[in-house]
Amino acid sequence: TGSGDSHDTDDSCLDVRGHNNVVENIKADNCLFGLDFKQSNNNLIRGNEIRSKELDLGVRGDGLRLWYSNDNIVEKNKIIESRDMVAWYAHRNTFRDNLGRRSRYSIHFMFANDNVVERNQFYDNAVGIYFMYTEGGKVRHNIISHSTGATGMGIGFKEASGAIIEYNEIIYCGIGIGSDLSPFQPDSTIEMRGNRFAYNGIGILFNSETGGNNMVDNIFEGNLTQVTYGGRGDNN
């Protein structure tokens, strides 16, 4: 418990620089950064509870960070009142059965390809899951609820391609799914199937009309606007 306060030196409760470790059942409290993995592959990160320092949201550190770290399993962790869980330049990681509450981004992927996000519960965060400059990835069987406020969004895409979004519950969010210039790569798609969008301000918002978004067997109920294309709404 209790890390330093410097963002310049990435002060954290646990700093990992190695492969094939098991990090489990740690309670990291009052940390600027919680668990920080850099260039660390094939680790099991399980059953940890992470809380940030009592700071304003924007100046907290990240609860869990994977930086240039691949093929890790992140499961059954609780990340509460942190800033973000991030995977930057981090590929083929699995995030499973985690709980994220009252943070900014539950998971923020950037330049991170082919990650899997399944059976997580994300409540009361500004954004549930965000894909930025990514290729591939699967998001399935998650519950994302109450991502509200000016930027409230369940799942977001920015110049992302090749993702599969299936069998998720996205409810009570400002925007269920928000997509900007996605899919980005030529001839790529984003597949959305079997999801439930309920009681959101907007079910799905497309900020650009690139095409390549395939939607099959999704349920829309009780959203103020079901789907908006470039500012044009469709409630049918």
Where are these regions (language model features)?
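Functionally critical loop-and-helix segments that line ligand-binding/catalytic clefts
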Residues: 150, 154, 180, 222-236
